[in-house]
């Protein structure tokens, strides 16, 4: 499903550049710091300054931004407003992306109430659960529908991104339903490995894995070692 442009076709990337996945993963981190700088009325930032804010080294910042065609000005740095626009455009944040959340337990409910989605162009258009007690509940103006209604909702309001926040044992079933409904991008919070067709983009967020990684570094710190990855 194609997203809706928020400000006309000129907001789309000029070309589909080949950008390394590691660089793509850092762009939202740069963007967050740039928003903070902009809110503080800072108009320019050096690669060193941006690197300090983001916890990376300056050479990596310069290399990452060069993939966007942004090289900054020697002795001045990067224009914060221009860089904000470049990264937002590259990440597709100048378009509206309709999203659906399946699973309205504690995590799903929190995601549905998160106001930060709208500020980045992610519009919640569907909320789904299998619990009869939740059906009909309004969350930020969006009604919770039964998961069986997913195909009908997707036909009426195409969904670009589906978020899975269900128990692990039903995650694959939910993923299959999203794919069957025409959803081509899925973010999986469920503690399970799921498979999707090659045409579908899948991202996995596993909080337990992140905690185990932190446990590894905490153990090293306690033993007097280095904490940095």
Please tell me what each predicted stretch does.
Residues 104:
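Glycine-rich Rossmann-fold phosphate-binding loop(s) that bind the pyrophosphate
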Residues 1-14, 63, 85, 158-159, ...:
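Flexible, compositionally biased loop and terminal segments
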Residues 1-43:
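Extreme N-terminal segment that seeds HTH/winged-HTH DNA-binding domains in transcriptional regulators
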Residues 118-140:
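NAD(P)-binding Rossmann-fold cofactor-contacting core
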Residues 44, 48, 53-99:
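HTH-adjacent hinge/linker in prokaryotic transcriptional regulators
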Residues 33-38, 140-229:
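Phosphate-bearing ligand-interacting subdomains
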Residues 107:
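Hydrophobic/small residue at the entry helix of a nucleotide-binding pocket
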């Amino acid at each position: 499903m194609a997203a809706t442009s928020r400000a006309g076709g000129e907001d789309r990337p000029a070309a589909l550049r080949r950008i390394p996945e590691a660089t793509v993963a850092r762009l939202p981190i740069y963007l967050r710091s740039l928003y903070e700088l902009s809110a503080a009325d800072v108009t320019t930032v050096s690669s060193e300054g941006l690197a300090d804010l983001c916890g990376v080294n300056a050479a990596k910042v310069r290399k990452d931004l060069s993939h966007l065609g942004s090289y900054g000005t020697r002795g001045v740095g990067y224009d914060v407003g221009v860089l904000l626009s470049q990264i937002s455009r590259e990440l597709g944040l100048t378009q509206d992306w309709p999203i659906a959340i399946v699973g309205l337990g504690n995590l799903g409910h929190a995601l549905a109430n998160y106001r930060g989605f709208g500020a980045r162009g992610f519009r919640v258009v569907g909320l789904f659960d299998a619990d009869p007690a939740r059906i009909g509940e309004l969350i930020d103006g969006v009604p919770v529908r039964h998961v069986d209604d997913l195909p009908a909702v997707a036909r009426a309001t195409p969904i670009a991104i589906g978020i899975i926040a269900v128990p692990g044992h039903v995650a694959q079933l939910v993923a299959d339903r999203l794919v069957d409904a025409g959803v081509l991008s899925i973010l999986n919070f469920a503690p399970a490995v799921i498979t999707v067709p090659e045409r579908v983009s899948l991202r996995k967020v596993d909080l337990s894995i992140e905690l185990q990684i932190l446990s590894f570094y905490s153990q090293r710190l306690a033993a007097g070692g280095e904490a940095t990855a």
